[in-house]
From Swiss-Prot:
Substrate binds at residues 67, 100-101. Its main location: periplasm. Its EC number is 3.5.1.38. Belongs to the asparaginase 1 family. It catalyses: L-glutamine + H2O = L-glutamate + NH4(+); L-asparagine + H2O = L-aspartate + NH4(+). This is Glutaminase-asparaginase. The keyword Hydrolase applies. PROSITE patterns: ASN_GLN_ASE_1, ASN_GLN_ASE_2, ASN_GLN_ASE_3. It is found in: Periplasm. SMART domains: Asparaginase. One of its GO terms (biological process) is asparagine metabolic process. InterPro entries: AsnASE_II, Asp/glu_Ase-like_sf, Asparaginase/glutaminase-like, Asparaginase/glutaminase_AS1, Asparaginase/glutaminase_AS2, Asparaginase_C, L-asparaginase_C, L-asparaginase_N. GO terms for cellular component: periplasmic space.
């Protein structure tokens, strides 16, 4: 009977990369002071025995680092491994445990590059497993519940945190000290309650099986950097980043991706000498950058990031510039993804 039950359950692979969900503190009172990336995947799985009721689960340690240290090479390595597993007939869904600092970047990268409709779920925690009221175990349980559910297919890469199912494209970390840290400007896709998924909306942008980007065809990514704008900003950082090899600069601007009059000449010159300029917004609750509203984007040959924050804009530009250097094509890609 146990064998029959296992045959009925979905097969889910948990790929572990480190982060707070694999962290440990000196005492149970340490919810914010701890060392990330200490606990291995087998111990994570053993800590949630209820996973066996949801799926046939096996784990694999892909890397063991804090997510602020993840590089483009790490993203490519992870993406290629996920793609290999997604191609396997005996894998129904994949969960990736990840640090929360750059979880939103990895989720969006995978959303753009994995040509599969199988459920891919990225999950983390805001507290280490050693802390009182740790959130990692339930987050992992919810992630496996979503990944093992056929209704999760075709919805792009998902993120499960704090009982919510978020789109990997839309979600971002909004605070660093609370468990309800991950929000989407346009709201969650759904909720998980006691292992059952409830869906409220679908992603509107191109992703996964409808994406023109394929992780299997990408071996390297161009250097793209982010420069932060503020009152009394100077052009020093922008020029330095371009001089040090940035093929594109994400302008993390105020408001509508606004460009200070002190910056405009430098950004115009950088664009004329070959550096792509992408205007984004660093407002807290989600920017929405309009083209040619205040800045003459057509005249300056600049690109706008639409509703993507600077971090996600960087991911999309890196992938887009593998295919094209044309600013009009880059803008088309921003509208569609």
């Amino acid at each position: 009977k146990e064998v029959e039950n296992q045959q009925k359950l979905a097969n889910v692979v948990i790929l572990a990369t480190g982060g707070t969900i694999a962290g440990a503190g000196a005492s149970a009172a340490n919810s914010a002071t701890y060392q990330a990336a200490k606990v291995g995947v087998d111990k994570l799985i053993a800590g949630v025995p209820e996973l066996a009721d949801l799926a046939n689960v096996r784990g694999e340690q892909v890397m063991q680092i804090a997510s602020e240290s993840i590089t483009n090479d790490d993203l490519l390595k992870l993406g290629k491994r996920v793609a290999e597993l997604a191609d396997s007939n005996d894998v129904d869904g994949i969960v990736i445990t990840h640090g929360t600092d750059t979880l939103e970047e990895t989720a969006y990268f995978l959303d753009l590059t994995l040509n599969t409709d199988k459920p891919i779920v990225v999950v983390g925690s805001m507290r280490p497993g050693t802390a009182m009221s740790a959130d990692g175990m339930l987050n992992l349980y919810n992630a496996v519940a979503v990944a093992s559910n056929k209704d999760s297919r075709g919805k792009g890469v998902l993120v499960t945190m704090n009982d919510e199912i978020q789109s990997g494209r839309d979600v971002s970390k909004s605070i660093n000290i609370k468990t309800e840290a991950f929000k989407s400007a346009w709201g969650p896709l759904g909720m998980v309650v006691e292992g059952k998924s409830y869906w409220f909306r679908l992603p509107a942008k191109r992703h996964t099986v409808n994406s023109e980007f394929d992780i299997k065809q990408i071996s390297s990514l161009p250097q793209v950097d982010i420069a932060y704008s503020y009152g009394n900003v100077t052009d020093t950082a922008y020029k330095a980043l371009a001089q040090n090899g940035a093929k594109a600069l994400i302008h993390a601007g105020t408001g509508n991706g606004s460009v200070s009059s002190r910056l405009t000449p430098a950004l115009q010159t950088l664009r004329k000498t070959g550096t792509q300029i992408i205007r984004s917004s660093h407002v807290n609750q989600g920017g929405f950058v309009l083209r040619n509203a205040e800045q003459p984007d057509d005249k300056n040959d600049w690109v706008v990031a639409h509703d993507l924050n600077p971090e996600k804009a960087r991911i999309l530009v890196e992938l887009a510039m593998v295919k094209t250097q044309d600013s009009k094509e880059l803008q088309r890609i921003f509208w569609e993804y």
